[in-house]
Structure formats: C-alpha cells, structure tokens
Amino acid sequence: MTLLTQQNIIIFSSIDWSTHWQLHHELTTSLTNSGNKVLFIENTGARSPKSGDFGRIINRIRFRIKSFHGFHQVSDKFFLYTPIFIPYPYSKFAIFINTFFIFSAIKRWTKVTNFINPIVVSFLPTPTIQLIIRKINPTLTIYYCADDMARFAQNPNKLRESENEFLRSSDLIFTTSHKMYERASKFSDSVSNFPAGVAFEKFNSSLKAPSVPEDMQAIEGKIIGYVGAITEVLNLNIIVELATTLSHTTIVLIGPKYINVS
C-alpha cells in the first residue's frame, strides 16, 4: 500500500472541528502527520437548523469573528475554514448563494496559499457541496459515506436523491458499514468498506488511570460505558432494556447531550 503524502487535500466535513473527537478528526490528523496539507471545511449541513443547534451556531459565530474571513491556520499543514451560509440545503436560492460565496472564498484562499491540484474528500453529499467540488475541479473526488444521514433527515428523499448523484460522480467511495457498502455499490464500482477502528493506545491507557472520577466513585458493580455524542442516533430503547435486564450493572453515558434522555 502506498502512503499518501505531499498532497493538498480539501475535506468537506459533516461536523465542526470543535465537536467531540470522531472519524473526521482522526482522518485529518493522520493525513497531516503523513506530510499532507489539509483544508478542513466545517459543516454546511444536510438539514435546516433546529432549536438545539443554537449553541453550535453561537460557537461558530465566535470562531468566525476570531478568524481571517473564516480561515484559521491551526498548524503548518492544517487549515480550518468556517463558512457562513444559508442553512436550507435544498432551496435553489440558498444553493446558488452558498455555492457562490463559499467557492469564491476557497478560490481566493487556494490562490494566495498556492494550494493547487487538491484531492477532495467529502462527508457531505448535498447539492451545494457537489457544485463547489465541480468548480474546484480536483484531481480526485472521494465521497466518505460515514453515516446514513437520510435516516434522520427532514427531507430524506431529497438527500437520498442528491447522494445517489454523488455516488455516481465520485471517483472513489469509502463506507463504514456493510449496509452502506451494498447500497453504494449499486451506483459505483469504486466502493471500499473501512469499518470504524479503534486507537488502541488511547483505550489501553485507561487501564492505568490513577483513580476513579469523583462523580463515579459511588457506583458499585460492573459498568457498561458509552463515550460519544448523545444524539438521535443512540437507541435509547435498547439502553433502557439493558438497564432493566442487567439490574446489577450501571450504564454510564459520557458526552455532549443533544436530545432529551429523561
């Protein structure tokens, strides 16, 4: 296997960089550690905003104010872009405006920084992102299908239709589950499945933890732990069933909460 290095890579992310650590962060870190330069473009959304998004919107505005027209150099090989956009991904007017302003900003930045002949990796299949990618005209387009976003989309049919088009047009497609691999393979012969992995050294280091956290010291017996975002993706019914069935086990959820779990 040839190591990818000394390349310019643009990542269109489906999350913001400040979000809890996920596949997107691991990919970016791995690419920069391998000698590539990465422009990480924060989430432009696959749905309209909800009331629960208010905190993230405020954080984005604060970061944008501190940056240079939305761009921020994190390290010598890692650059972050926080775009301002109209949050209606399937409105023709919003698509036109968002495409124009986001692409114009990227074009100016790549020209100034000599960020030429980029490879594009996109976690988003939305119409705006696809139009921007065509305008960039990258040497390679990769759709990283990390989640079935249509399951929770407000407009699942529109998102699915847009994703189908992106599956047909992308040079390479990466999936993270057999189900998504099978679906993507209906539209492309260039699909590879890479299930999410584990950074073993991070998990192994927990065995050497100096002490139990103060807010968990009163827990007796075995613990089933979950670390990650507490969102609609989490099957709360299964968790409740586990808690009821395994009466001598405590279930602990650790992470930012975006849904009501009471």
PLM-predicted stretches and their roles:
Residues I129, Y144-P156:
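A short, histidine- and acid-enriched strand-loop-helix "catalytic/donor-clamping" loop
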Residues M1-F63, A243-L246, T250:
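N-terminal subdomain of nucleotide-sugar transferases
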Residues L39, S169-S177, S192, G225:
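A short beta-strand/loop micro-motif in the catalytic core of glycosyltransferases
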Residues K50-V112:
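A conserved catalytic-core segment of Leloir-type glycosyltransferases
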